[in-house]
From Swiss-Prot:
Similarity comment text for this entry: Belongs to the eIF-6 family.
Keyword Protein biosynthesis: yes
InterPro entries per record: eIF6
GO biological process: cytosolic ribosome assembly
Keyword field: Initiation factor, Protein biosynthesis
Role description: Binds to the 50S ribosomal subunit and prevents its association with the 30S ribosomal subunit to form the 70S initiation complex.
Matching SMART domains: eIF6
Gene3D superfamilies: L-arginine/glycine Amidinotransferase, Chain A (3.75.10.10)
CDD domains: IF6
Organism of derivation: Pyrococcus horikoshii (strain ATCC 700860 / DSM 12428 / JCM 9974 / NBRC 100139 / OT-3)
The protein, known as: Translation initiation factor 6
Gene Ontology molecular function, alphabetical: ribosome binding; translation initiation factor activity
Keyword Protein biosynthesis: yes
Length: 227
């Protein structure tokens, strides 16, 4: 299956607790093995359990694509080394970079695939350029539907994108041009507009919160290129 419903200890906000790329998924510590297996089988990449200063909200704090993982600057050295060691054991060559900024909810403020990154306009132009260089992609500063939390308001892979339902047609066109994929509006978890918080997705599949309805799943599958 390209899409599976899941909960993390009854929370439907899967995107808060993980970062999905086409090469690896970083996920919070402490999930049941059967849930890790659903993620592995659906997204078809290795899954690494991680923490950031012992926090479980990995998807809020970190982001990444096939080239690099970006973490907040205060992540412990031991946590960085654990991620690097796990990547090495899987034969995955990726940068793992702590990023110094006063903004540390990087997963909320950065939306990226392997083609481009959209970063919140809260970041300076210099910071945006640095983020683009780390991720190895074109970068733009901006908002989605008036929201700085672009990583929460959207999910984008190398096959498609889904964003906040109040995103304008002009913004959709701009996002499609930037990320080089078709981008649609939609919701998850029974009407939640912050779709980035609700799912973990890559080019192989998507794991979405267990409250997501049938019609929402149809739209998610279409938007992320699985139809």
């Amino acid at each position: 299956m390209h899409i599976e419903r899941l909960d993390f200890e009854n929370s439907p906000y899967l995107g808060v607790f993980g970062v999905a790329t086409d090469r690896v998924v970083l996920i919070r510590e402490g999930l049941q093995e059967k849930k890790l297996e659903v993620i592995r089988e659906t997204l078809k990449v290795p899954v690494i359990e991680v923490s950031v200063m012992k926090s479980r909200i990995i998807g809020t704090l970190a982001t990444g694509n096939s080239n690099a993982i970006i973490l907040p600057w205060y992540v412990w050295d031991a946590e960085i080394e654990r991620i690097k060691k796990a990547l090495s054991e899987y034969g995955i060559d990726m940068e793992v970079v702590p990023f110094r900024s006063k903004y540390t909810a990087l997963g909320n403020l950065i939306l990226t695939n392997d083609k481009a990154a959209l970063v919140s306009a809260k970041f300076s132009r210099k910071e945006a350029q640095e983020i683009g260089e780390i991720l190895g992609v074109e970068v733009e500063r901006g908002v989605i539907a008036g929201l700085h939390a672009v990583g929460s308001a959207g999910v984008v892979t190398n096959k498609g994108g889904l964003v906040h339902p109040e995103t304008s047609d002009e913004e959709l066109e701009w996002l499609s041009d930037l990320f080089k994929v078709d981008v649609y509006v939609g919701t998850a978890n029974m009407g939640v507009p912050y779709v980035g918080t609700c799912m973990l997705a890559n080019s192989n599949g998507v794991v979405v919160g267990h409250l997501t309805t049938g019609p929402e799943i149809v739209k998610i599958e279409e938007a992320l290129g699985f139809v």
